[in-house]
Amino acid sequence: MVTIRLARGGAKKRPFYNIVVADSRNARDGRFIERVGFFNPLARGQEETLRLDLDRVEHWVATGAATSDRVAKLIKDARKATA
């Protein structure tokens, strides 16, 4: 099953997450199909916290991809920010 989920990056104690489309059988930080955005929970000042390609997210959801709980919340926030 294809899922849209967070893949952790960054340094120790400084998380940075890529929002990726991946097969659910692959490891969290392993192989993915497509990177559709990023989430930086520790962004300061003018740094960007969230960037999502909503067109590609819509494409994958229409194709049948499931979203993790956290990614669903981030998508909702991104839609609210663009509206």
Curated annotation (Swiss-Prot):
Gene Ontology, cellular component aspect: cytoplasm; small ribosomal subunit
A GO molecular-function annotation: structural constituent of ribosome
Entry superkingdom: Bacteria
Record's keyword terms, sorted: Ribonucleoprotein, Ribosomal protein
InterPro entries, per database record: Ribosomal_bS16, Ribosomal_bS16_CS, Ribosomal_bS16_dom_sf
One GO term of the biological process aspect: translation
Entries under HAMAP family matching the protein: Ribosomal_bS16
Family: Belongs to the bacterial ribosomal protein bS16 family.
Family matches, as PANTHER family: 30S RIBOSOMAL PROTEIN S16 (PTHR12919), SMALL RIBOSOMAL SUBUNIT PROTEIN BS16M (PTHR12919:SF20)
Protein name: Small ribosomal subunit protein bS16
Biological source species: Shewanella denitrificans (strain OS217 / ATCC BAA-1090 / DSM 15013)
